[in-house]
């Protein structure tokens, strides 16, 4: 029998990048929906999937993407749009639910945010809850998972914790650092998303998912610091405006300002599991604790594991912050040679240089504040050095 076709929306995002390989390993056919398919070119699994260019904010692009689809994963958000994104998210969800119904899709699986709908919520968290409600308003059965902080290399919330903890020996923070969170390992999020495909107990339900324990946000940062061997102290500084925190996060982490602003605003309420029905509905999911998830994330801060999001088929030099590393990429066009990786452990962090026949890529994983200062102070020299190496066969 031909395996069912699974559509993954938000294919260039973090969750999709971890879900798609697991779907392929499980024998499913996968179609990836992306506004810009070029951003998928460098993924190891690109040649194993069907890629369709579409946009959930443009309803006329959806019928072709949904044709022949058995189950669709709804993994998109519009926080990067900035002002007005919440209305756009609801309109997109409504259009997607309608298009899925017309295409004969049998199941929608949605990953939303973990929060108490009865509390006063920031726009980001309220929108996540309302998006699920809109999807469930259609005729296609919807399984909704609500998750808080996702612990894994590349997760937006985890990268905020990582970079802020690495950067500041004394971490200032607003009062919401005392709020509670129940983080869940990325492996377990994917376990739940996969289990929903075949487990009939979950079809049509809303499930709050979290890890084994509850922590304050300050605890999460201190536990990360302990895993990294960093000494960190926290102090609360009430009255720090959200825009100021978001600006700092955007400057020092891979998270863009509009997303940082929305996420930080969402930290004003607790994010804990109050209804643990997922544990009974999906007993096949074995939960991993936060410390183990952090250790796994740190092990993935290595070129062997980092998603090549910068390989989009477009020539030119690229600079980015991604999955715990600063990355410089330069096309070389030497036309010959075999890829070589050089590694150097320095006082301020870990350096890797990948030398290929067509490009050179420098990875730097900083160790604490000295690592950040080293990178930024010597940033122009890193480019000069990489260009010099790029001219050598």
Q: What are the residue ranges of the model-derived segments?
A:
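Mid/C-terminal beta-alpha module of Rossmann-like enzyme folds, strongest
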Residues: 2-5, 195-262, 270-334
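N-terminal Rossmann NAD(P)H-binding glycine-rich loop of SDR-like oxidoreductase domains
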Residues: 3-28
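NAD(P)H-binding glycine-rich loop region in Rossmannoid oxidoreductase-like domains
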Residues: 38-103, 113-117
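Glycine-/Pro-rich loop/turn segments that contact NAD(P) or position catalytic residues
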Residues: 78-167
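Substrate-positioning beta->alpha
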Residues: 92, 156-157, 176-197, 205
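Glycine-rich "substrate-gating" loop/helix at the edge of Rossmann-like oxidoreductase active sites
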Residues: 148-154, 175-186, 210-213, 284
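Beta-strand/loop substructures that line and gate deep hydrophobic ligand-binding cavities in soluble
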Residues: 348-380
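A conserved amphipathic terminal alpha-helix motif
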Residues: 374-393
